[in-house]
Amino acid sequence: MALRFPRFSQGLAQDPTTRRIWFGIATAHDFESHDDITEERLYQNIFASHFGQLAIIFLWTSGNLFHVAWQGNFESWVQDPLHVRPIAHAIWDPHFGQPAVEAFTRGGALGPVNIAYSGVYQWWYTIGLRTNEDLYTGALFLLFLSAISLIAGWLHLQPKWKPSVSWFKNAESRLNHHLSGLFGVSSLAWTGHLVHVAIPGSRGEYVRWNNFLDVLPYPQGLGPLFTGQWNLYAQNPDSSSHLFGTSQGAGTAILTLLGGFHPQTQSLWLTDIAHHHLAIAFLFLVAGHMYRTNFGIGHSMKDLLEAHTPPGGRLGRGHKGLYDTINNSIHFQLGLALASLGVITSLVAQHMYSLPAYAFIAQDFTTQAALYTHHQYIAGFIMTGAFAHGAIFFIRDYNPEQNEDNVLARMLDHKEAIKSHLSWVSLFLGFHTLGLYVHNDVMLAFGTPEKQILIEPIFAQWIQSAHGKTSYGFDVLLSSTNGPAFNAGRSIWLPGWLNAVNENSNSLFLTIGPGDFLVHHAIALGLHTTTLILVKGALDARGSKLMPDKKDFGYSFPCDGPGRGGTCDISAWDAFYLAVFWMLNTIGWVTFYWHWKHITLWQGNVSQFNESSTYLMGWLRDYLWLNSSQLINGYNPFGMNSLSVWAWMFLFGHLVWATGFMFLISWRGYWQELIETLAWAHERTPLANLIRWRDKPVALSIVQARLVGLAHFSVGYIFTYAAFLIASTSGKFG
C-alpha cells in the first residue's frame, strides 16, 4: 500500500476516519512524537527548520522592499515626509468600479493603492536609504540571504553536515557565539552602518559603495580613537535648527549623549543611537568571552549553577541539577526563550512610541497606533507560549530525582501557596477596580458626577517627577534643580532629556490622573489573572490532588472518560487555551487605553479622556462608539470612500470572531449527527455523488474544536480592532 499522510506516524496513517488528516496536521511539528525519532534526529530537524524560518523572514522583508520600490512613492515621500502619504503597494481588484478607483487612488499614485502604516518608510529613510534603486538593491540582497538560508538548511540535513547531539548541547560555546558573534558583532556592524551611511545621509551626504572609502564620517577619522581623545567624537553635534537630510544646521559629531529628541524629526538623535549601539556591542563582545570552551579559561555554566545555593540552608538546594535539566530539555529552553522574547516585544511596543528612533514616525499617528498594538498582541501570544512549553517540560522532561529540593522542585512543593496568592490578588484587583468603575457609572447616571471616587496616582506621579517631570510640583531628584543628580547630568544628556519629558507634544511620560489609575488596575487584573491560569496550568501539569496521575495522559487530553468525574478541562493545554482569552482581553484594555489617551493628546482635547475614562459608560460611549463612526461611514448614500475597506474588515472581523463560538459552545455529538446527515444527502445527490472519499467523516475531537474556536476568536478579535484602530486614527489625522 502507498504511504498515506502522515508518514511520520504509521499508526495514524492507518486511521480510517478524517481524524487522520486533522491529527496529522496537529502533530506534524511535534517531532518528539514521530515514529523512529531519535534525540539526534530531533535536534537536527529543529536546527534545519530554523534555516527555513530565516529564509521565510528574509523573503518577506525582501518583498516589502521590492513592492515599495516597484509600486510605492518612496522618492517623493523622502522630499516631504510629513505631507506625502507613504504607499505600501498597488491594489489590483477587478471588482472596483469608478468610485472605488477614485477613493483608493492616493499619495500621488496613478491607480488604487494601500497606504503603509508599518513605519518602513521612516525606518528606511532614517538608516540612509533615499532612492528606489536603494530599495531594489536591499530586496535583492535579502533574496540572496533567503536562498543562502534554504541551502544551509538543506545542507545541515545531509549526512556529512549533520551536527552531533554533543554539538547542540555545548552550552558555553553557544552562549559565546550568540553573545559575541550575533549580538556583539551585529551591533558593532550596525554602529558602523549608522556612522558611515546613516549619519552622513542625515546631513545630506549620499554614501554608497562607490564613495564609501572617500567620505570620512568624521573629519579626523580614526585619529581620536588611537590617541585616546574619544570625547572629540561628541564635539560639534547637530544643532537644534538642523534640517534632517540636509547639511543645514548639521554638525560633525558621530557618537553623542545629547538626550531628548531632534526638534524637527521628533525622534532620538541619530548620533545618540550610534553611541548606544557601540556601547551594546562592547558589552556583548566582552560577555561572549566569559564562558569556558576549548581554552580552559572562563566560567563553566554547570559550576555557576551548582554554586547558586541559598545561604542559611532554609531555602533548599538552589540551582543544583538545573544545568542538566535545562540542557536536556528543548521545551525548557524554548520556554525561557519565549518568556524573554515576549517581554522584549512588549518593551519594543512601549519604546517605539515613547522614544521614537525613526525620523518623523512620531508625527505619523496611525503608524504609531498600529505598531504599538501589533507589538503588544504579539508579546501576548509569545508570553502565553512560554508557559505552554513550561508545562510540556514538566510533563515530558522533568525528572524529580535530578531536581531534588532545588528551585524547580520547591516551586512544585509550594504550588498551593503560589496559586492562592495569585488568586487573592486577582480577586482583590477585580472587585475593587470594577467596584470603583461601577460606583462612578451610577453617580454619572444619577446626575451627581461630583460624587465619583477619583484617586490620584500619586506614587506614579512621584516616579515621573523623579525622572524630571515638573508639572506635578514634587521637588525630587531630577525635577529638583539643586540636587546632586540634576547637577551631575547638567552638562551632558540632561537638558535634552528634561526638555523632552516636560514638552507636551510627545508621548514621553504622559500626564496621568484618576482615569489612568483605574485603567492601570484593570490591566493589572488582566495580567494577574492570565498569569494565574498559566502558572496553575504549568504547576499542575504533572498532577493535582484531583488527578495525581495527570502526567501519564500527556499535555492535551479532554477527560479521563466517564469513570472519573471532574477530569475534563484540567489538562495543561486547557489552561493555555483559557489563558489566551484572558490575554486577549488584557491586551484589549491596554490598547484601548493607549489609543484613546493618544487620540485626545493628538487632537488637543486631553480633558475628554480625563473626564470620560473614570466610568465604564465613558469608555463605551466616548471611545468605542464615538470612534467607530468612521467605520460605519465607509459606505453611505453618497457612495464609498477610502475607509470602506476598513468598514468591510470591521464587519468581517466580527463574523470570524462570532464563528469561533460555533466551535467553542457546541460539542462533538451535534457535529457528528450533522456530518452524517450531510454525508447521507451527498450520497443521494446526482453528480455530487460521483465524488467519493476514502476516510469516514467524523467530528473534530474536543481539543481540536477548542483550538479551531480559539483561532477564530483570536483572529476575529484582532481583525476587528485593527480595522477600528486604523480607520478611526487615519480618518481623523489623514
From Swiss-Prot:
The alphabetical list of record keywords is: 4Fe-4S, Chlorophyll, Chloroplast, Chromophore, Electron transport, Iron, Iron-sulfur, Magnesium, Membrane, Metal-binding, Oxidoreductase, Photosynthesis, Photosystem I, Plastid, Thylakoid, Transmembrane, Transmembrane helix, Transport
Please write the reaction equations for the catalytic activity of this protein.
Answer: reduced [plastocyanin] + hnu + oxidized [2Fe-2S]-[ferredoxin] = oxidized [plastocyanin] + reduced [2Fe-2S]-[ferredoxin]
Binding residues for chlorophyll a B3: M662, Y670
The molecular function GO annotations come to: 4 iron, 4 sulfur cluster binding; chlorophyll binding; electron transfer activity; magnesium ion binding; oxidoreductase activity
The transmembrane segments are 46-69, 135-158, 175-199, 273-291, 330-353, 369-395, 417-439, 517-535, 575-596, 643-665, 707-727
Q: Where does [4Fe-4S] cluster bind?
A: C559, C568
Specify which residues bind chlorophyll a B1 according to the UniProt entry for this protein: H654
Give the CC-aspect GO terms. chloroplast thylakoid membrane; photosystem I
Q: Which residues form a coiled coil?
A: none
One Pfam family it belongs to: PsaA_PsaB
Task: Look up the EC number in the record and give it.
Answer: 1.97.1.12
UniProt main location, coarse: plastid
The keyword Ion transport is assigned to this record = no
Kindly indicate whether the keyword NADP belongs to this entry: no
The record's top EC class is: oxidoreductase
Q: Which protein family is named in the record?
A: Belongs to the PsaA/PsaB family.
Show the HAMAP family listed in the entry: PSI_PsaB
What the protein does?
PsaA and PsaB bind P700, the primary electron donor of photosystem I (PSI), as well as the electron acceptors A0, A1 and FX. PSI is a plastocyanin-ferredoxin oxidoreductase, converting photonic excitation into a charge separation, which transfers an electron from the donor P700 chlorophyll pair to the spectroscopically characterized acceptors A0, A1, FX, FA and FB in turn. Oxidized P700 is reduced on the lumenal side of the thylakoid membrane by plastocyanin.
Name of the protein: Photosystem I P700 chlorophyll a apoprotein A2
- Which lineage? Eukaryota, Viridiplantae, Streptophyta, Embryophyta, Tracheophyta
